[in-house]
Amino acid sequence: MKYNRNALYINVLPFARYFRQRFAPLSATGGGRKATTTELHKQKTVYTNRVRRLAVRSDNMKTDRVITAMIEYFGSDKKRIHHFLKVYSFAKTIGESENLLPDDQELLEISAIVHDIGIKVSEEKYNSSAGKYQELEGPHEAEKLLAALGYEKTFIDKVCYLVGHHHTYGNIDTLPYRILVEADFLVNLYEDDSSRSAAEQAYDKIFRTNTGKNLLKIMFLIP
């Protein structure tokens, strides 16, 4: 967790207290009856599921803040807003299907939300949305936005690296990087109304994860 780390722990404490209070009498060898294995397992499952729901809720609340900030950043530019939301959705799906570690999943999702943040400045300064300008201008804009939301510098630096390289395909060396590129391709191929031939080229040259390749095959009817 790279944002509001203490919030989850604070919310979990009541359940931790409940867990201890609930099991103390059951497992006591004195006045209370001894719990059966089935009872203990059932109660532990309830407790674990509650903690997991809290963790998911905490992550979603954090992601929502970044999404809202990006929508405010793009304002009435509905095309850019819809684009980053689609890339985020694909990236999240691929990352979860590929069983990314939690820190990598968080890095992937936040990077997907802000990956095109440099496009606004690029169009203003260079009258172009070319990838090279996005990579040039994006990291600084991403740093400002994430710092304002309270993210740690080490995490921001990792996001900025992906933002500054998401149109560079020659040296993809991490799974978050790979999945971000694949998610962006899935959306761009659709938005550009690309042919199946173009999708097949991307399949051969870009896509490496099983989930990403499968999604591309389904969407573009690749045999």
Predicted regions and their residues:
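Short Gly/Ser/Thr- and charged-rich N-terminal loops/segments
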Residues: 20-34, 53-55
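An active-site-proximal "capping" alpha-helix that borders the catalytic cofactor pocket
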Residues: 87, 132-148
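Active-site flanking loop/helix segments enriched in acidic
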Residues: 63-86, 118-128
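Divalent metal-dependent phosphate-bond-processing catalytic cores, especially two-metal-ion Mg2+/Mn2+ enzymes
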Residues: 72-101, 114, 151, 166-223
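Short hydrophobic alpha-helical segments enriched in small aliphatic residues
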Residues: 7-12, 16, 24, 28, ...
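Short, Lys/Arg-enriched N-terminal segments with co-localized hydrophobic residues
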Residues: 42-60
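His-Asp-centered metal-binding catalytic motifs of divalent-metal-dependent phosphohydrolases/nucleases
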Residues: 105-124, 138, 160-167
